[in-house]
Amino acid sequence: MSQARPATLRVAVLGAGSWGTALAAAASRRHPTVLWARDGAQAQAMAARHENTRYLPGVALPHALQVSADLAQALAHLAHDPAHALIILGVPVAGMTPLCTELAARLPALGLQAVPLVWTCKGFEEQTARLPHETVQAALGAMPGLAAGVLSGPSFAREVAQGLPVALTVASGSSAVRDAVTTALHGAAVRIYASTDVVGVEVGGALKNVIAVACGICDGLALGTNARAALITRGLAEMARFGAALGAQQETFAGLTGLGDLVLTATGELSRNRRVGLEIGAGRKLADILASGMTAEGVRCARAARDRARALNIELPITEAVCAVLFEGLSPMTAVSALLAREARPESPTP
């Protein structure tokens, strides 16, 4: 770390889904932590049972973790010592704009505008095709002293909440953000690596979900592990090309938030994106899958990723194929055949 920080931070995690809850549990094992849930009944149940029965059933949460449905109360927890505090946004991409807009009104009034802030969502905003840092900049960029970054990496929330080992990357141009996240989470079961490549980390986190859907489709079609390995490898090339066009550092895609997260999401049994792909490959329709309650960020952001890539003239054949299957009625096997029929070309380690 670039400078020494106190042993104790005040942490507020905003968003009580599976990932927000898991990070709050990890932070609360060493630091005073408040988890904010928008749903009052959910917050009350979590506080009473020390369990998030909606998103992480069966996982016991630390008794030290405070849960509140009052955003003002969660932020007031930080106001006692704003110089030694951290805000973690645990909401999905779709929740970033409303939450950041609300924070823009609240943080300066409480003297919290310079508190380090990180988001954890992965994907492109559906309506705008923005990456999360662009959403944060649009909502909070005018706030003086803003220090922000992204926390990402190969991680299933349930395992983190259970205290199993995980390695994550915090990316920010601010050393205060990198240091605060390391202080809050780095410990026996959580290893934090630091980076300055916000764009690269975000592109990896977004596109790996789309590639994981493709890998699930491949597995659902029983095309074998060779085909899955090819999709993972060429999917990584798509991530690197997209990142290069946006100014990302290429080495980021060989790290935790690129290759690491892609392998986990494309192969892990807990991966929702892979499960959706498996169902598609087995012949189910997307509408039926979504109606059953199964959700996946790869479905939400696939079109936005494709549209932004087209606007930038970036070639993303796997992403294009996933969109054609999900939204345009192309059969999975026809999509595979089209990918295999592409013109032969040299393989290059660079985009």
Swiss-Prot record:
MF term (GO), any: NAD binding
Superkingdom of the organism of origin: Bacteria
Binding site for sn-glycerol 3-phosphate: 122, 153, 155, 208, 261, 271-273
Pfam families in UniProt: NAD_Gly3P_dh_C, NAD_Gly3P_dh_N
Subcellular location: Cytoplasm
Enzyme type, top EC level: oxidoreductase
Gene3D superfamilies the record matches: N-(1-d-carboxylethyl)-l-norvaline Dehydrogenase, domain 2 (1.10.1040.10), NAD(P)-binding Rossmann-like Domain (3.40.50.720)
Chain residues that bind NADPH: 18-19, 38, 122, 157, 272, 297
Keyword entries, A-Z: Cytoplasm, Lipid biosynthesis, Lipid metabolism, NAD, NADP, Nucleotide-binding, Oxidoreductase, Phospholipid biosynthesis, Phospholipid metabolism
InterPro entries: 6-PGluconate_DH-like_C_sf (IPR008927), 6PGD_dom2 (IPR013328), G3P_DH_NAD-dep (IPR006168), G3P_DH_NAD-dep_C (IPR006109), G3P_DH_NAD-dep_N (IPR011128), NAD(P)-bd_dom_sf (IPR036291)
Matching SUPFAM superfamilies: 6-phosphogluconate dehydrogenase C-terminal domain-like, NAD(P)-binding Rossmann-fold domains
Recorded metabolic or biological pathway in which this protein acts: Membrane lipid metabolism; glycerophospholipid metabolism
GO biological process: carbohydrate metabolic process; glycerol-3-phosphate biosynthetic process; glycerol-3-phosphate catabolic process; glycerophospholipid metabolic process; phospholipid biosynthetic process
Enzyme Commission no: 1.1.1.94
Residues at the active site: 208 (proton acceptor)
Keyword DNA-binding assigned: no
Catalyzed reactions: sn-glycerol 3-phosphate + NAD(+) = dihydroxyacetone phosphate + NADH + H(+); sn-glycerol 3-phosphate + NADP(+) = dihydroxyacetone phosphate + NADPH + H(+)
Function summary: Catalyzes the reduction of the glycolytic intermediate dihydroxyacetone phosphate (DHAP) to sn-glycerol 3-phosphate (G3P), the key precursor for phospholipid synthesis.
NCBIfam families recorded: PRK00094.1-2 (NF000940), PRK00094.1-4 (NF000942)
Family per similarity comment: Belongs to the NAD-dependent glycerol-3-phosphate dehydrogenase family.
Protein name as it appears in the record: Glycerol-3-phosphate dehydrogenase [NAD(P)+]
Protein source organism: Bordetella pertussis (strain Tohama I / ATCC BAA-589 / NCTC 13251)
Source lineage: Bacteria, Pseudomonadati, Pseudomonadota, Betaproteobacteria, Burkholderiales
